[in-house]
Amino acid sequence: MNALVALVGRPNVGKSTLFNRLTRSRDALVVDQPGVTRDRKYGLAHYGEQSFFVVDTGGVMEQESGIGRLMRAQAQLAIEEADVIFFLVDGREGLSSLDEEIAAWLRCAQKPLKLVINKAEGRDGDLVASEFYRLGLGEPIIISAQQGQGVGRLLEALLTLLPVLEREESEIQAKGLQFAVIGRPNVGKSTLVNRILGEERVLSSEIPGTTRDSISIPFRHHGKDYTLVDTAGIRRRSRILDKVEKFSVIQSLQSIAIAQVVILVIDAHDSVVEQDLHLAGVILESGKGVVIAVNKWDGLPLEQRQRVKTDLDRRLPFLVFARIHFISALHGSGVGDLFPSIDEAYQSANSHLPTGELNRALLAAVEKYPPPVVKGRRIKLRYAHQGGQNPPKIIIHGNQAEAVSANYRRYLINYFRNAFGLMGTPIALEFRTVKNPFKGRANILTQRQQQKRKRLVRFRKGRD
Protein backbone atom coordinates (compact mmCIF):
# COMPACT_ATOMS: atom_id res chain seq x y z
CA MET A 1 0.00 0.00 0.00
CA ASN A 2 1.28 3.48 -0.81
CA ALA A 3 2.45 5.60 2.10
CA LEU A 4 0.89 8.95 3.01
CA VAL A 5 2.83 12.20 3.48
CA ALA A 6 1.06 15.08 5.27
CA LEU A 7 2.05 18.71 4.61
CA VAL A 8 1.52 20.77 7.77
CA GLY A 9 2.22 24.40 8.61
CA ARG A 10 0.74 27.82 9.17
CA PRO A 11 -0.86 29.72 6.25
CA ASN A 12 1.22 30.98 3.33
CA VAL A 13 4.33 28.91 3.97
CA GLY A 14 4.02 27.21 0.57
CA LYS A 15 2.22 23.95 1.33
CA SER A 16 0.00 24.13 -1.75
CA THR A 17 2.97 25.05 -3.94
CA LEU A 18 4.91 22.05 -2.66
CA PHE A 19 1.81 19.89 -3.09
CA ASN A 20 1.53 20.90 -6.73
CA ARG A 21 5.26 20.40 -7.21
CA LEU A 22 5.15 16.88 -5.80
CA THR A 23 1.97 15.80 -7.58
CA ARG A 24 2.63 17.87 -10.72
CA SER A 25 -0.94 19.08 -10.22
CA ARG A 26 -2.23 15.66 -11.18
CA ASP A 27 -4.60 13.57 -9.10
CA ALA A 28 -5.39 16.63 -6.98
CA LEU A 29 -8.74 16.28 -5.27
CA VAL A 30 -10.42 19.16 -3.45
CA VAL A 31 -13.19 18.14 -1.10
CA ASP A 32 -15.54 21.08 -0.72
CA GLN A 33 -17.40 20.26 2.47
CA PRO A 34 -18.08 22.61 5.36
CA GLY A 35 -16.01 22.17 8.47
CA VAL A 36 -13.14 19.77 8.79
CA THR A 37 -12.73 18.69 5.18
CA ARG A 38 -12.99 22.05 3.42
CA ASP A 39 -10.27 22.62 0.78
CA ARG A 40 -8.14 19.68 1.84
CA LYS A 41 -6.20 18.45 -1.15
CA TYR A 42 -5.12 14.89 -1.83
CA GLY A 43 -2.87 13.67 -4.61
CA LEU A 44 -0.58 10.93 -5.82
CA ALA A 45 3.14 11.62 -6.25
CA HIS A 46 5.94 9.60 -7.82
CA TYR A 47 9.69 9.62 -7.25
CA GLY A 48 11.65 7.02 -9.14
CA GLU A 49 9.88 3.72 -8.56
CA GLN A 50 8.31 4.95 -5.31
CA SER A 51 4.72 6.20 -5.24
CA PHE A 52 3.10 7.91 -2.27
CA PHE A 53 0.03 9.95 -1.41
CA VAL A 54 0.28 13.60 -0.37
CA VAL A 55 -2.27 15.55 1.66
CA ASP A 56 -2.26 19.32 2.13
CA THR A 57 -3.90 19.81 5.52
CA GLY A 58 -4.57 23.51 5.09
CA GLY A 59 -3.13 26.42 7.05
CA VAL A 60 -3.04 26.38 10.83
CA MET A 61 -4.33 29.75 11.99
CA GLU A 62 -3.67 31.44 15.28
CA GLN A 63 -6.60 31.54 17.67
CA GLU A 64 -7.13 32.34 21.31
CA SER A 65 -6.73 28.70 22.16
CA GLY A 66 -3.48 28.38 20.22
CA ILE A 67 -3.65 25.63 17.68
CA GLY A 68 -7.15 24.95 18.91
CA ARG A 69 -10.06 23.39 17.13
CA LEU A 70 -9.13 24.45 13.62
CA MET A 71 -5.86 22.55 13.67
CA ARG A 72 -7.35 19.46 15.23
CA ALA A 73 -10.43 19.47 13.02
CA GLN A 74 -8.59 20.13 9.77
CA ALA A 75 -5.37 18.18 10.24
CA GLN A 76 -5.90 15.57 12.93
CA LEU A 77 -7.25 12.83 10.71
CA ALA A 78 -4.62 13.35 8.02
CA ILE A 79 -1.81 13.36 10.57
CA GLU A 80 -3.15 10.25 12.29
CA GLU A 81 -3.24 8.43 8.97
CA ALA A 82 0.09 9.81 7.74
CA ASP A 83 3.28 7.78 7.62
CA VAL A 84 5.49 10.88 7.36
CA ILE A 85 4.89 14.55 8.21
CA PHE A 86 6.53 17.47 6.39
CA PHE A 87 6.42 20.52 8.68
CA LEU A 88 6.78 23.61 6.47
CA VAL A 89 8.05 26.95 7.74
CA ASP A 90 8.77 30.24 5.96
CA GLY A 91 12.46 31.03 5.48
CA ARG A 92 11.71 34.65 4.61
CA GLU A 93 9.67 35.50 7.69
CA GLY A 94 11.70 33.36 10.07
CA LEU A 95 10.55 31.49 13.15
CA SER A 96 7.21 32.49 14.68
CA SER A 97 5.49 31.60 17.93
CA LEU A 98 2.87 29.69 15.96
CA ASP A 99 5.64 27.61 14.35
CA GLU A 100 6.87 26.68 17.83
CA GLU A 101 3.37 25.74 18.93
CA ILE A 102 2.78 23.60 15.84
CA ALA A 103 6.14 21.88 16.35
CA ALA A 104 5.20 20.96 19.90
CA TRP A 105 1.84 19.62 18.68
CA LEU A 106 3.46 17.54 15.95
CA ARG A 107 5.96 15.97 18.32
CA CYS A 108 3.01 14.50 20.19
CA ALA A 109 1.92 12.73 17.01
CA GLN A 110 4.97 10.44 17.29
CA LYS A 111 5.31 10.13 13.52
CA PRO A 112 8.44 10.48 11.35
CA LEU A 113 8.80 14.23 10.99
CA LYS A 114 10.95 16.37 8.70
CA LEU A 115 11.32 20.13 9.07
CA VAL A 116 11.17 21.86 5.67
CA ILE A 117 12.27 25.49 5.30
CA ASN A 118 10.59 26.93 2.22
CA LYS A 119 11.06 30.23 0.34
CA ALA A 120 14.82 30.13 0.86
CA GLU A 121 15.82 31.09 -2.69
CA GLY A 122 18.63 33.65 -2.83
CA ARG A 123 19.42 33.29 0.87
CA ASP A 124 22.32 31.82 2.81
CA GLY A 125 21.15 28.34 3.81
CA ASP A 126 23.09 28.16 7.07
CA LEU A 127 21.86 31.58 8.14
CA VAL A 128 18.24 30.76 7.29
CA ALA A 129 18.36 27.44 9.13
CA SER A 130 20.09 28.71 12.26
CA GLU A 131 17.03 30.05 14.09
CA PHE A 132 14.94 26.96 13.30
CA TYR A 133 17.29 24.60 15.13
CA ARG A 134 15.68 25.73 18.38
CA LEU A 135 12.59 23.73 17.39
CA GLY A 136 14.58 20.57 18.13
CA LEU A 137 13.44 18.78 14.99
CA GLY A 138 16.85 17.88 13.65
CA GLU A 139 18.53 18.94 10.42
CA PRO A 140 16.06 20.85 8.22
CA ILE A 141 15.73 20.54 4.45
CA ILE A 142 15.95 23.93 2.72
CA ILE A 143 13.89 24.28 -0.46
CA SER A 144 12.14 26.61 -2.84
CA ALA A 145 8.88 24.88 -3.72
CA GLN A 146 8.10 27.49 -6.35
CA GLN A 147 11.39 27.05 -8.23
CA GLY A 148 11.93 23.40 -7.36
CA GLN A 149 15.25 23.98 -5.61
CA GLY A 150 16.03 21.38 -2.96
CA VAL A 151 12.92 19.30 -3.71
CA GLY A 152 15.09 16.43 -4.94
CA ARG A 153 16.96 16.38 -1.61
CA LEU A 154 13.63 16.44 0.19
CA LEU A 155 12.43 13.40 -1.75
CA GLU A 156 15.68 11.56 -1.07
CA ALA A 157 15.18 12.26 2.63
CA LEU A 158 11.61 11.03 2.33
CA LEU A 159 12.77 7.63 1.06
CA THR A 160 14.70 7.11 4.30
CA LEU A 161 11.64 8.04 6.36
CA LEU A 162 9.04 5.91 4.61
CA PRO A 163 8.21 2.91 6.77
CA VAL A 164 8.23 -0.64 5.53
CA LEU A 165 4.52 -1.31 5.53
CA GLU A 166 3.43 -4.49 7.18
CA ARG A 167 2.39 -6.00 3.90
CA GLU A 168 2.57 -4.68 0.40
CA GLU A 169 -0.28 -5.06 -2.04
CA SER A 170 1.26 -8.17 -3.56
CA GLU A 171 1.55 -9.74 -0.12
CA ILE A 172 -2.08 -9.34 0.92
CA GLN A 173 -3.49 -12.79 1.40
CA ALA A 174 -6.33 -12.28 -0.99
CA LYS A 175 -8.15 -14.70 -3.21
CA GLY A 176 -9.07 -14.00 -6.79
CA LEU A 177 -9.83 -10.69 -8.41
CA GLN A 178 -9.67 -7.72 -6.02
CA PHE A 179 -12.21 -4.93 -6.40
CA ALA A 180 -13.25 -1.90 -4.36
CA VAL A 181 -16.52 -0.01 -3.99
CA ILE A 182 -15.99 3.77 -4.10
CA GLY A 183 -18.42 6.66 -3.85
CA ARG A 184 -19.33 9.84 -2.01
CA PRO A 185 -21.38 9.78 1.23
CA ASN A 186 -24.85 8.27 1.30
CA VAL A 187 -24.83 6.81 -2.21
CA GLY A 188 -25.32 3.30 -0.85
CA LYS A 189 -21.78 1.91 -0.73
CA SER A 190 -22.32 0.05 2.53
CA THR A 191 -25.65 -1.30 1.36
CA LEU A 192 -24.06 -2.55 -1.85
CA VAL A 193 -21.16 -4.17 0.02
CA ASN A 194 -23.53 -5.87 2.44
CA ARG A 195 -25.72 -7.02 -0.44
CA ILE A 196 -22.72 -8.53 -2.25
CA LEU A 197 -21.28 -10.22 0.81
CA GLY A 198 -24.62 -11.19 2.30
CA GLU A 199 -25.78 -12.92 -0.84
CA GLU A 200 -22.50 -14.67 -1.46
CA ARG A 201 -21.80 -15.69 2.17
CA VAL A 202 -18.31 -14.65 3.25
CA LEU A 203 -16.06 -17.69 3.17
CA SER A 204 -13.66 -16.52 5.88
CA SER A 205 -13.29 -13.80 8.45
CA GLU A 206 -11.80 -10.43 7.68
CA ILE A 207 -8.09 -10.60 6.93
CA PRO A 208 -6.12 -7.83 8.65
CA GLY A 209 -4.44 -5.64 6.10
CA THR A 210 -1.79 -2.99 6.49
CA THR A 211 -1.42 -0.31 9.11
CA ARG A 212 -4.28 1.56 7.46
CA ASP A 213 -6.80 -0.94 8.91
CA SER A 214 -7.58 -2.12 5.41
CA ILE A 215 -9.41 -5.40 5.16
CA SER A 216 -9.67 -7.94 2.40
CA ILE A 217 -12.85 -9.98 2.39
CA PRO A 218 -12.71 -13.09 0.21
CA PHE A 219 -15.92 -14.60 -1.13
CA ARG A 220 -17.13 -16.74 -4.01
CA HIS A 221 -19.62 -15.88 -6.73
CA HIS A 222 -20.78 -18.57 -9.16
CA GLY A 223 -17.74 -20.69 -8.40
CA LYS A 224 -15.23 -17.88 -8.88
CA ASP A 225 -13.10 -16.30 -6.16
CA TYR A 226 -13.18 -12.56 -5.50
CA THR A 227 -11.82 -10.28 -2.80
CA LEU A 228 -13.57 -7.11 -1.73
CA VAL A 229 -11.00 -4.51 -0.70
CA ASP A 230 -12.20 -2.16 2.02
CA THR A 231 -10.03 0.47 3.72
CA ALA A 232 -12.85 2.12 5.63
CA GLY A 233 -11.78 0.22 8.72
CA ILE A 234 -14.60 -0.68 11.11
CA ARG A 235 -12.34 0.01 14.08
CA ARG A 236 -11.52 3.49 12.82
CA ARG A 237 -15.12 4.64 12.85
CA SER A 238 -15.24 4.83 16.62
CA ARG A 239 -12.28 7.19 16.85
CA ILE A 240 -12.68 9.74 14.06
CA LEU A 241 -14.79 12.84 13.68
CA ASP A 242 -18.36 12.21 12.54
CA LYS A 243 -18.10 14.39 9.43
CA VAL A 244 -14.82 12.84 8.43
CA GLU A 245 -16.22 9.37 9.01
CA LYS A 246 -18.72 9.87 6.21
CA PHE A 247 -16.15 10.65 3.56
CA SER A 248 -12.39 10.18 3.87
CA VAL A 249 -10.74 10.77 0.53
CA ILE A 250 -7.54 9.06 1.52
CA GLN A 251 -9.49 5.89 2.26
CA SER A 252 -10.88 5.98 -1.26
CA LEU A 253 -7.40 6.56 -2.68
CA GLN A 254 -6.01 3.63 -0.73
CA SER A 255 -8.85 1.39 -1.91
CA ILE A 256 -8.17 2.38 -5.51
CA ALA A 257 -4.44 1.72 -5.07
CA ILE A 258 -5.02 -1.81 -3.80
CA ALA A 259 -7.89 -2.87 -6.05
CA GLN A 260 -7.63 -4.24 -9.57
CA VAL A 261 -11.11 -3.03 -10.52
CA VAL A 262 -13.09 -0.15 -8.97
CA ILE A 263 -16.87 0.14 -8.76
CA LEU A 264 -17.90 3.81 -8.73
CA VAL A 265 -21.30 4.15 -7.05
CA ILE A 266 -23.49 7.11 -8.04
CA ASP A 267 -26.79 8.13 -6.45
CA ALA A 268 -29.50 8.21 -9.11
CA HIS A 269 -31.55 10.70 -7.08
CA ASP A 270 -28.72 13.26 -7.20
CA SER A 271 -27.48 12.32 -10.69
CA VAL A 272 -23.80 13.19 -11.35
CA VAL A 273 -22.40 15.79 -8.93
CA GLU A 274 -18.96 17.36 -8.48
CA GLN A 275 -17.69 14.82 -5.97
CA ASP A 276 -18.57 12.04 -8.41
CA LEU A 277 -16.48 13.79 -11.05
CA HIS A 278 -13.55 14.15 -8.65
CA LEU A 279 -13.58 10.47 -7.76
CA ALA A 280 -14.01 9.48 -11.40
CA GLY A 281 -10.95 11.54 -12.28
CA VAL A 282 -8.88 9.87 -9.57
CA ILE A 283 -9.93 6.43 -10.80
CA LEU A 284 -9.05 7.36 -14.38
CA GLU A 285 -5.60 8.62 -13.35
CA SER A 286 -4.97 5.38 -11.45
CA GLY A 287 -5.36 3.39 -14.66
CA LYS A 288 -7.53 0.78 -12.93
CA GLY A 289 -10.49 -0.98 -14.47
CA VAL A 290 -13.80 0.68 -13.62
CA VAL A 291 -17.50 -0.20 -13.49
CA ILE A 292 -20.19 2.42 -12.81
CA ALA A 293 -23.12 1.46 -10.59
CA VAL A 294 -26.02 3.93 -10.55
CA ASN A 295 -27.78 3.09 -7.29
CA LYS A 296 -31.34 3.76 -6.03
CA TRP A 297 -32.71 3.27 -9.55
CA ASP A 298 -35.89 1.55 -8.39
CA GLY A 299 -38.94 3.77 -8.18
CA LEU A 300 -37.29 6.59 -10.12
CA PRO A 301 -39.69 8.34 -12.54
CA LEU A 302 -39.06 7.77 -16.24
CA GLU A 303 -38.29 11.44 -16.85
CA GLN A 304 -35.68 11.49 -14.08
CA ARG A 305 -34.11 8.26 -15.36
CA GLN A 306 -33.64 9.83 -18.76
CA ARG A 307 -32.08 12.90 -17.18
CA VAL A 308 -29.59 10.74 -15.26
CA LYS A 309 -28.57 8.91 -18.44
CA THR A 310 -28.09 12.23 -20.21
CA ASP A 311 -25.93 13.51 -17.34
CA LEU A 312 -23.79 10.37 -17.45
CA ASP A 313 -23.07 10.89 -21.14
CA ARG A 314 -22.51 14.61 -20.76
CA ARG A 315 -20.45 14.77 -17.56
CA LEU A 316 -18.48 11.52 -17.72
CA PRO A 317 -17.29 11.34 -21.34
CA PHE A 318 -13.81 10.38 -20.13
CA LEU A 319 -15.27 7.13 -18.72
CA VAL A 320 -17.10 6.21 -21.90
CA PHE A 321 -15.35 2.81 -21.81
CA ALA A 322 -16.92 1.86 -18.45
CA ARG A 323 -19.96 -0.40 -18.28
CA ILE A 324 -22.89 1.31 -16.56
CA HIS A 325 -25.35 -0.65 -14.41
CA PHE A 326 -28.57 0.71 -12.95
CA ILE A 327 -29.12 -1.08 -9.66
CA SER A 328 -30.90 -1.11 -6.33
CA ALA A 329 -28.47 -2.20 -3.64
CA LEU A 330 -31.30 -2.22 -1.10
CA HIS A 331 -33.47 -4.67 -3.03
CA GLY A 332 -30.68 -6.42 -4.92
CA SER A 333 -31.88 -5.73 -8.44
CA GLY A 334 -29.03 -5.56 -10.94
CA VAL A 335 -26.31 -6.30 -8.37
CA GLY A 336 -25.49 -9.71 -9.81
CA ASP A 337 -24.95 -8.15 -13.24
CA LEU A 338 -21.95 -6.25 -11.91
CA PHE A 339 -19.74 -9.33 -11.84
CA PRO A 340 -19.50 -9.96 -15.61
CA SER A 341 -18.45 -6.32 -16.03
CA ILE A 342 -15.89 -6.64 -13.21
CA ASP A 343 -14.42 -9.70 -14.94
CA GLU A 344 -14.44 -7.97 -18.31
CA ALA A 345 -12.67 -4.88 -16.96
CA TYR A 346 -9.96 -7.01 -15.32
CA GLN A 347 -9.40 -9.14 -18.41
CA SER A 348 -9.27 -6.08 -20.66
CA ALA A 349 -6.79 -4.32 -18.37
CA ASN A 350 -4.47 -7.32 -18.48
CA SER A 351 -4.90 -8.16 -22.16
CA HIS A 352 -1.95 -9.29 -24.28
CA LEU A 353 -2.04 -7.53 -27.66
CA PRO A 354 0.03 -9.34 -30.31
CA THR A 355 2.29 -7.01 -32.27
CA GLY A 356 1.06 -8.30 -35.62
CA GLU A 357 -2.57 -7.65 -34.77
CA LEU A 358 -1.73 -4.23 -33.38
CA ASN A 359 0.01 -3.22 -36.59
CA ARG A 360 -2.87 -4.46 -38.73
CA ALA A 361 -5.28 -2.46 -36.58
CA LEU A 362 -3.04 0.63 -36.84
CA LEU A 363 -2.84 0.29 -40.64
CA ALA A 364 -6.62 -0.06 -40.90
CA ALA A 365 -7.17 2.96 -38.63
CA VAL A 366 -4.77 5.12 -40.65
CA GLU A 367 -6.31 4.06 -43.96
CA LYS A 368 -9.81 4.83 -42.70
CA TYR A 369 -8.87 8.21 -41.25
CA PRO A 370 -5.32 9.44 -42.08
CA PRO A 371 -3.42 11.54 -39.52
CA PRO A 372 -3.55 15.31 -40.00
CA VAL A 373 -0.99 17.40 -41.87
CA VAL A 374 1.46 19.27 -39.63
CA LYS A 375 3.76 21.98 -41.01
CA GLY A 376 2.99 20.93 -44.55
CA ARG A 377 3.78 17.28 -43.95
CA ARG A 378 1.40 14.48 -43.10
CA ILE A 379 2.13 12.55 -39.93
CA LYS A 380 3.19 8.99 -40.72
CA LEU A 381 2.47 6.30 -38.14
CA ARG A 382 4.56 3.27 -39.10
CA TYR A 383 4.24 0.53 -36.49
CA ALA A 384 2.94 -0.23 -32.99
CA HIS A 385 3.61 -2.64 -30.14
CA GLN A 386 2.38 -3.15 -26.60
CA GLY A 387 4.34 -1.39 -23.88
CA GLY A 388 2.54 -2.57 -20.75
CA GLN A 389 -0.61 -3.82 -19.09
CA ASN A 390 -3.05 -2.66 -16.43
CA PRO A 391 -3.89 -0.44 -18.21
CA PRO A 392 -2.93 -1.59 -21.70
CA LYS A 393 -0.22 0.66 -23.11
CA ILE A 394 0.34 0.90 -26.86
CA ILE A 395 3.51 2.49 -28.22
CA ILE A 396 3.25 3.91 -31.74
CA HIS A 397 6.33 4.86 -33.79
CA GLY A 398 6.36 7.19 -36.77
CA ASN A 399 7.42 10.49 -38.29
CA GLN A 400 6.23 13.57 -36.36
CA ALA A 401 4.39 11.16 -34.08
CA GLU A 402 4.66 13.55 -31.15
CA ALA A 403 2.53 16.05 -33.11
CA VAL A 404 -0.57 13.81 -33.06
CA SER A 405 -3.53 15.89 -31.90
CA ALA A 406 -5.76 15.03 -28.95
CA ASN A 407 -8.68 14.33 -31.29
CA TYR A 408 -6.69 11.87 -33.37
CA ARG A 409 -5.38 10.26 -30.19
CA ARG A 410 -8.97 9.68 -29.05
CA TYR A 411 -9.82 8.27 -32.48
CA LEU A 412 -6.98 5.74 -32.24
CA ILE A 413 -7.92 4.76 -28.69
CA ASN A 414 -11.52 4.11 -29.73
CA TYR A 415 -10.36 2.17 -32.79
CA PHE A 416 -8.07 -0.07 -30.73
CA ARG A 417 -10.78 -0.49 -28.11
CA ASN A 418 -13.28 -1.70 -30.69
CA ALA A 419 -10.72 -3.82 -32.53
CA PHE A 420 -9.64 -5.72 -29.41
CA GLY A 421 -12.82 -5.47 -27.33
CA LEU A 422 -11.15 -3.59 -24.47
CA MET A 423 -14.02 -2.48 -22.24
CA GLY A 424 -13.83 -1.32 -18.66
CA THR A 425 -10.23 -0.13 -18.81
CA PRO A 426 -8.46 3.02 -20.01
CA ILE A 427 -5.93 2.67 -22.82
CA ALA A 428 -2.63 4.54 -22.72
CA LEU A 429 -1.00 5.65 -25.99
CA GLU A 430 2.63 6.70 -26.29
CA PHE A 431 3.94 8.22 -29.51
CA ARG A 432 7.60 8.04 -30.46
CA THR A 433 9.14 9.79 -33.43
CA VAL A 434 11.47 7.63 -35.48
CA LYS A 435 14.87 9.27 -35.46
CA ASN A 436 16.53 9.88 -38.82
CA PRO A 437 20.20 8.82 -38.42
CA PHE A 438 21.20 11.00 -41.39
CA LYS A 439 19.47 14.17 -40.19
CA GLY A 440 21.93 17.07 -40.03
CA ARG A 441 24.67 15.23 -41.90
CA ALA A 442 26.04 16.40 -45.23
CA ASN A 443 25.22 14.17 -48.17
CA ILE A 444 28.76 13.26 -49.28
CA LEU A 445 28.87 11.59 -52.70
CA THR A 446 31.24 8.77 -53.49
CA GLN A 447 33.76 9.20 -56.33
CA ARG A 448 31.60 7.09 -58.61
CA GLN A 449 28.51 9.20 -57.80
CA GLN A 450 30.49 12.38 -58.49
CA GLN A 451 31.58 11.07 -61.92
CA LYS A 452 27.98 10.12 -62.72
CA ARG A 453 26.81 13.60 -61.79
CA LYS A 454 29.45 15.18 -64.07
CA ARG A 455 28.31 13.00 -66.98
CA LEU A 456 24.68 14.04 -66.40
CA VAL A 457 25.69 17.70 -66.33
CA ARG A 458 27.67 17.37 -69.61
CA PHE A 459 24.76 15.47 -71.17
CA ARG A 460 22.26 18.20 -70.26
CA LYS A 461 24.59 20.94 -71.55
CA GLY A 462 25.02 19.02 -74.84
CA ARG A 463 21.25 18.89 -75.30
CA ASP A 464 20.96 22.62 -74.69
Swiss-Prot record:
PROSITE patterns listed in its UniProt record: G_ENGA
Sequence similarity: Belongs to the TRAFAC class TrmE-Era-EngA-EngB-Septin-like GTPase superfamily. EngA (Der) GTPase family.
GO biological process: ribosome biogenesis
Upper taxonomic lineage: Bacteria, Pseudomonadati, Pseudomonadota, Gammaproteobacteria, Chromatiales
Binding residues annotated for GTP 2, in chain numbering: 183-190, 230-234, 295-298
Name of this chain's protein: GTPase Der
Pfam families: KH_dom-like, MMR_HSR1
HAMAP family: GTPase_Der
Description of how the protein assembles with itself and partners: Associates with the 50S ribosomal subunit.
Function: GTPase that plays an essential role in the late steps of ribosome biogenesis.
This protein's UniProt keywords: GTP-binding, Nucleotide-binding, Repeat, Ribosome biogenesis
Domain of life of the organism encoding this protein: Bacteria
Organism: Nitrosococcus oceani (strain ATCC 19707 / BCRC 17464 / JCM 30415 / NCIMB 11848 / C-107)
Alphabetized GO MF terms: GTP binding; ribosome binding
Start and end residues of each EngA-type G domain: 3-166, 177-350
